Amino acid sequence: IGITGSKGKTTTTTIITHILKELGYHVFTGGNIGIPLFNQIENMKKEDIVVLELSSFQLMEMPVSPDIAVITNISPDHLDVHGSYEEYIHAKKYIFKNQRINNKLVLNHDDEIVKNFSKEAKSQVSFFGNQEIKDGFYLKEDKIYYNEEKVIDTNNLMLKGKHNYLNICA
């Protein structure tokens, strides 16, 4: 699982890791989050899950895409390195560039640029956001829903703030 975006990468990576561990999966977390995975490769098994926080710089060097890719949002960032906002957006697309039809791409429906990535995806696409979404998680009236079914009341969450609730939806 790879997570990228201008904001929310670390939080979303941490949330996904926590949820998977709570469900009983053996999870390795790394990438831009500061945990080197190279030393852990020998300990990994085929059934283990790797959750990676991926920066635009890392994405440009990747010859493969993760089976599940998440894009939290995009706003002008690192323009000193990328040269332009368009180049930065292009770099973020590398997370799904090499996905296959049986892979999954999770996009922020509230971010027009990110939402439009669905037009270029070869993989299955689902969305998350602030409005009702078919086949996706969304935030409505302090509750998180999936396909119109309430999953949790945000008052029951330790993390606070609308931005964190959207990270949970991702």
What are these regions (language model features)?
Residues 84-86, 93, 123-170:
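Adenine nucleotide phosphate-binding catalytic loops in nucleotide-utilizing enzymes
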Residues 1-109, 113-124:
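Phosphate-binding loop of NTP-binding sites
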